[in-house]
Each structure stands twice: as structure tokens, then as C-alpha cells.
């Protein structure tokens, strides 16, 4: 496989094709998803229409990238979305091998469900990048599939650490996913409406991850 510029997707369908290649490379069998459907979900009502905090409080939330007032703010949005998506795919790379040694059938089901939902969350972030941020977004969406936790080049250090044992997984879902819940909660108030609207469904799914570690 060439570098990410050789596989830069121009459409969402092309990105999905590259995503399927990522699944093959990391050894995630799509059949493990069962009847779980990878999809893009929004809760527009929960996102609200009005900016809640900061210098732009009280104004209409931004629905397109060009409505964001400054390039530095658009760059910050791309960074936040990219980091969130990067963690989702990284966690699958860290955890995938554990399915072969699950202590119980339920543990295997729980881990497979968590990995399915993490892939959906990664999809969601890639969709935002592909749909709203032009060529820069397409580049970042592709790079989500190029970095790999096993190579130690995911963006956040915690998502490059090996997870050799199920106790690691349980601690991960107890603490790292708990931190992730608060991160999603903060993003749910984003002034960029598509990002805020992405968080409602993600938070609902994240609650199962926390329950697994509790």
C-alpha cells in the first residue's frame, strides 16, 4: 500500500473502501460486527441552534466550515475531530487480538460490541472531515487509516500502549473510556453544529463501554 496521498479519497464511498482495507490490515473480521451497522448518526435537536459559550455566545451555531470566523478556529476544529477519530481506530488496533482469549462468551460479546461502536465513532469523525473540510479534511480522514497503534504512531500516547491482557481491557474501559465520556460531553457543546450533533449518539454508545469496565 502506498502513502496516504496515493489513496486520498475524493468521496465518502472511496473512504469507506479504504476503511475496509484498514480492517483487513489490522485483522478485524467484519463478520465480528454481527448485525451492527456502521453508520453516520446525528442528534440535531440535542445539538441546539445557539452557541452556548465564549465570544460568540448567543449567535447561531455554525453549520458549515466557512461560517467559522477564523482559519485558526477551523484548524482547531479539524484537530479536535482528527484526534477523536484517531483514538477510536487506535483502540480497535489495541484490543482486537483479545477476542481470541475472552474469559467468557459475554466478555467476547462485550469487547466485539465496543470495537464495533468505536469503529462507528471513527466513521463519524471521518465523515465530518470528508464532508465539511475540503481537501485538508480528506487528507486527515485518510491518515486516520494510515496511522497504527502497533507502530506507535497514533496521536495520543495512551493509544499506542500494548494491551496484552484482559485486565488491561477492563481497566481501559473503566478509566480511559470514562475520560472519553467527558471529552465527548465537552464536544457536545461545540459551536460547530455537525460536531455537536455527532455527540448524542456517541455518548449513548459510550455508556456501554463504561458499564463493561465497572
Each model region followed by its residue ranges:
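Inter-helical turn/loop segments and adjacent helix faces that build the functional surface
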Residues: 97-109, 133, 182-201, 214
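Alpha-helical transition-metal enzyme core signature, strongest for iron centers
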Residues: 84-92, 114-129, 148-152, 170-181, ...
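Conserved aromatic-histidine-acidic binding/catalytic patches
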Residues: 72, 76-87, 106, 110-117, ...
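Internal, hydrophobic cores of structured domains that mediate oligomerization or house catalytic pockets
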Residues: 162-169, 176-180, 186-187
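Terminal targeting/low-complexity segments that flank the catalytic cores of oxidoreductases
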Residues: 1-109, 131-163, 167
Amino acid at each position: 500500500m502506498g502513502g496516504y496521498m496515493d489513496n486520498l479519497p475524493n468521496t465518502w464511498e472511496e473512504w469507506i473502501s479504504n476503511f475496509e482495507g484498514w480492517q483487513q490490515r489490522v485483522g478485524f473480521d467484519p463478520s465480528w460486527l454481527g448485525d451492527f451497522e456502521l453508520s453516520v448518526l446525528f442528534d440535531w435537536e440535542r445539538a441546539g441552534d445557539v452557541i452556548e459559550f465564549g465570544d460568540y455566545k448567543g449567535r447561531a451555531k455554525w453549520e458549515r466550515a466557512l461560517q467559522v470566523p477564523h482559519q485558526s478556529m477551523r484548524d482547531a476544529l479539524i484537530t479536535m475531530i482528527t484526534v477523536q477519530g484517531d483514538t477510536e481506530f487506535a483502540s480497535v488496533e489495541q484490543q482486537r487480538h483479545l477476542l481470541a482469549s475472552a474469559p467468557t462468551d459475554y466478555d467476547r460479546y462485550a469487547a466485539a460490541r465496543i470495537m464495533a461502536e468505536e469503529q462507528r465513532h471513527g466513521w463519524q469523525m471521518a465523515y465530518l472531515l470528508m464532508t465539511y473540510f475540503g481537501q485538508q479534511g480528506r487528507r486527515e480522514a485518510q491518515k486516520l487509516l494510515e496511522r497504527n497503534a502497533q507502530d506507535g504512531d497514533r496521536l495520543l500516547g495512551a493509544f499506542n500502549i500494548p494491551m496484552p491482557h484482559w485486565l488491561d481491557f477492563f481497566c481501559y474501559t473503566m478509566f480511559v473510556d470514562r475520560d472519553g465520556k467527558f471529552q465527548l460531553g465537552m464536544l457536545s457543546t461545540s459551536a460547530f453544529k455537525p460536531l455537536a450533533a455527532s455527540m448524542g449518539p456517541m455518548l449513548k454508545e459510550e455508556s456501554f463501554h463504561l458499564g463493561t469496565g465497572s
